[in-house]
Each structure stands twice: as C-alpha cells, then as structure tokens.
C-alpha cells in the first residue's frame, strides 16, 4: 500500500519482528505516507490525562512504572489464533498496549530481562503461548518498569501504575478509574474512559464474564463493549481528521509514523530473546 502511495492504518501488533516493522516504517517514510498503528490505549481519557499531568510535573520525575494484565483462562470451544505464538506472538505481542503505553511515558527501554513460561495451559486443548510473563525494563537513566502478562492468574489484575518523585498515578482497568496521589497524601479521582457510565460498564464486564477481562478477546459478530467502542470511535475520528488535513498533536506524532509501534516490538523481541537465552538483553541487539 505504501509503495502505491496509500496511507496506512495497521492494527497491533503491526508485525511480529523488529525487521518487519523496520521495513514497514521505512517504506512509509520513503513514500511520504501516514502509517498509523492501532495502539488504541493512547486514546483512553485517563492515559491522555496522565501524560498531561506528567508533562506538567504534577508527580515529579517518573522513576518507575508497573503494569499488569492478567487473569485466568479455561479451555475454549476452539483454540483461537491468538493462542498460537506463530500467529499472534502470544500475550507479549497481542497485548502490547501496556508496554507501548509505558514507553510513550518513559521512552524506549534500553535493556530487558524476561522470565516466565507456560505454567498451567499445556495440552491439546490449549495453544502454545506462554501463560505467565514478567518483563523487567531498564531505561538507561536510573528508571525502571515491570510489565506482567498472562492467563495463569486466578486473581485478575489490569492496571498501569506510574511512580514519580512527587506522587503517583494509577490507571485501573479492572475496578475502572484513575487515581492521582500527591506527595501530601491527597488523592484525585478521574475517569479512565469518556465518562463514569462507561467506566462502570467495563468494571461490570471484568467481574461477570466467562473469561477475565484482561485476557478476553472478541469474536466475529460479537458487539464491542461500550469502553472499546468509545475509544475505537475516538481513534477512527482522529485518523479520519488527519486524512483530511488536521494537524497531528505532539503526543500522537510517534503513533502516526509507526515509530512507537516499532519501538514496542523491538522491546518485545529483546524480551523474547532474554527468555530464550536466559540473560539480560540490550534492545539495540535486535535492531542491528
């Protein structure tokens, strides 16, 4: 498409290897077309607000982030393509939103260590993806992050926690809401999505579905929930605006060249190499 001078929208993960991502990004640059990655978490009201507060210095310098996206999965009637690593990359790639969100806030990771494996979902009724993964990210400036993924957790969690020198921000996507805690102990509360009705509906889904909300996935013909519908509409409205000449705000510029998506895949590839070779990996290793 890019070689034929067509603008591109690509869902996440944009590819399952850094080399493929790099070719996609460079081809779009060479042909001067937009390359938007579908990293829809950037359109959460709470995520945008958190970025704004961080830029304003409300929680000071960001020191550490911790995300968790995990739950428990029972055998399904059929094995989804998302459970086959060769097709989806497993949790690390098809749930790459939280990793992307953290790197949008803290910059690209420089070194990665990943541990985990398939601890509870082996057998013919399951795919071959790892069901428990822990990423330890280093950013080269004495700042760090932990990212958890998996479907082997009976206590489901889904959040991004950002710790700074003057406060902290927690974006909770299970008991849905955003909390800003300042150094004097005061707390401020905000919606994660466009309004409280949508937040409450997502909370209900997390506590009532057959599959924990952090790991559930859609099916053809299944209507998207309110929260997903609202952010998809925001994402497509933004993309349509850009296609018709609207300026791109600074916060979204890396999203519109594929560079942020490429950086997330680079970190994911480094994490995969770390797990396979049981060592700490510099992200630049996979970028050569």
Per-region residue spans from a language model:
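Terminal low-complexity tails and localization/encapsulation signals of metabolic enzymes
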Residues: 280-288
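Short, well-ordered coil/turn segments that N-cap beta-strands
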Residues: 6, 33-34, 61-63, 141-143
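C-terminal glycine/acidic-rich active-site capping loop/insertion
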Residues: 40, 166-259, 288
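Structural detector of well-ordered beta-strand residues that form the stable sheet scaffold
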Residues: 9, 34-36, 66, 113, ...
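Predominantly a Rossmann-like dinucleotide-binding segment in NAD(P)-dependent oxidoreductases
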Residues: 34, 41-127, 278
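Aromatic/hydrophobic pocket-lining residues that form π-stacking "cages" and hydrophobic walls in ligand
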Residues: 24, 50, 270
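Beta-strand-loop-alpha-helix segment that lines the small-molecule cofactor/substrate pocket
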Residues: 1-42, 57
């Amino acid at each position: 498409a890019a070689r034929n001078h067509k603008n591109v929208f690509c869902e996440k993960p944009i590819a399952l290897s850094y080399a493929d991502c790099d070719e996609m990004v460079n081809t779009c640059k060479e042909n001067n077309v937009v390359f938007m990655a579908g990293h829809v978490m950037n359109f959460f009201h709470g995520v945008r607000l958190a970025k704004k507060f961080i830029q304003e210095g409300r929680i000071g310098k960001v020191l550490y982030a911790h995300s968790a996206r995990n739950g428990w999965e029972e055998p399904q009637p059929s094995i989804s393509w998302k459970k086959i690593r060769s097709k989806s990359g497993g949790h690390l790639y098809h749930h790459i939103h939280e990793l992307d969100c953290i790197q949008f806030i803290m910059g690209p990771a420089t070194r990665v260590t990943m541990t985990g494996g398939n601890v509870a979902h082996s057998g013919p009724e399951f795919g071959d993806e790892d069901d428990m993964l822990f990423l330890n990210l280093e950013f080269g400036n004495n700042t760090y992050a932990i990212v958890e993924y998996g479907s082997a957790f009976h206590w489901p969690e889904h959040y991004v926690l950002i710790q700074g020198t003057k406060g902290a921000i927690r974006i909770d996507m299970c008991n849905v809401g955003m909390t800003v805690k300042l150094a004097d102990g005061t707390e401020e509360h905000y919606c994660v999505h466009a309004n409280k009705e949508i937040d409450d509906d997502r909370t209900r889904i997390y506590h009532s579905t057959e599959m924990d909300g952090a790991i559930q996935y859609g099916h053809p013909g299944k209507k998207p929930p309110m929260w997903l519908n609202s952010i998809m509409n925001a994402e497509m409205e933004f993309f349509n605006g850009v296609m018709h000449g609207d300026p791109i705000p600074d916060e979204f510029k890396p999203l519109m060249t594929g560079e942020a998506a490429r950086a997330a895949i680079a970190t994911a590839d480094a994490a995969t190499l770390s797990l396979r070779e049981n060592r700490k990996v510099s992200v630049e290793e996979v970028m050569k």
